[in-house]
UniProtKB/Swiss-Prot annotation:
Keywords, sorted A to Z: Mitochondrion, Ribonucleoprotein, Ribosomal protein
Pfam families the UniProt entry points to: Ribosomal_S3_C
Name this protein carries in UniProt: Small ribosomal subunit protein uS3m
The organism of origin for this protein: Marchantia polymorpha
One cellular-component annotation, GO: ribonucleoprotein complex
Keyword Lyase in annotation: no
Family, similarity comment: Belongs to the universal ribosomal protein uS3 family.
The keyword Ribonucleoprotein appears for this protein: yes
GO terms of molecular function: RNA binding; structural constituent of ribosome
Location(s) in or outside the cell: Mitochondrion
Amino acid sequence: MAQKVNPISVRLNLNRSSDSSWFSDYYYGKLLYQDLNFRDYFGSIRPPTGNTFGFRLGRCIIHHFPKRTFIHVFFLDRLSQSRHQGLGAIPSVKLIRRINDNTVKQRNEVGIWPKKRYEYHDRLPSIQKIDQLLRVSDWMADIHSTFQSIWPKDENDDRRASEERYAFSRFAPSILVAVRAEKKKAIFGSEGDFFGFTGRAFLDYFVMQYFFNLKNQIQFDPMVNRSPVAQGVAKTSMIGKAIPAKTEQGTQSGESICQPRSTLYFDAIIFLRYARFRKATSLSSRYYYLKKMQSLFSNQTKTNTLIQPVKIASVYQSASLIAQEISWKLEQKKSFRQICRSIFKQIKKCPYVKGIRIGCSGRLNGAEIAKTECKKYGETSLHVFSDQIDYAKTQASTPYGILGVKVWVSYFLTQKKGTSCAISKTYKIS
């Protein structure tokens, strides 16, 4: 019977924690509905289609507190996964460390605290700052040399060292200019980063914000905004609107009178048209978009919502990422057996993976009759409840119909010294 149920559900509170947690029985239905909306929103952000790498979501952990919501988003790093080679590119970079209750140093690095007697954290999350809720160790190791050239080396400054490890830090404008001038392309890449989808999602936010304020009849002027996008629109929108001043009216020579544009609809259309073609690549614009997305969730749920993104360096750290990669390859008309051989070849290089099982159902390779194929490598015993198993399923749209993909990944419970760990254990934060 263990093979017929979700392996995650039968292992909850054993070696797997829940993706969602809240402390309310009365608002159970409301919070469950919010979780479904949050996950649907993150899943709809630039899905991998065609030659587009897209936004690969590994896992989304949501914690609901009274008037406060924490969302931890684990996503695949675009820079560490080649779009052309796909599963064949396993980078030699440091992976995200395992988060458990055995090491005090790791708990301090990620800012997550163990459970206490009454099943809640000893320290209140509201005491911590927004940027210190979830700290990932060594994720910015590749750009360490850039910040060393900007900041003088000081071993005693812990705050400066911690700022380099934040996924989103509040850098000064001078630092942004230096980073953009020196290693902008090498650090952030061209497209497919966590906020590479900003060109479209940034537009979706202001569309929803526009209709929300229009419904409530609140004066909404996109020009009054600190965003560099809004400032650019404010400058360009006055082109062609200037009227030469007349000397009869007592104005000085060289001045101009601008026509007022207080219409809500006209301002929003100009702003959205400009934001449609804008693509945010700098760290400041991505940080600004993250804050706007948090503001959108906070307004809709009437709670203070905080989003903390965490990068995943390898696709084999999550079954969801493997399933998305297989689905993407199948949509590109790749052979299922060829995909499995490529995965099994790279699994040997991952010391934290114990085994993997892949199942695909449908009209494979255009077969007239649908069938199910299952390939496995290593040990994936579903009857042993003590095994640490991650499970995911997805669909692939092909010209012959929809193919269903299921992935089971088994990880080692103990990790050798000097090797990286899978993110399946990093979920023990509740």
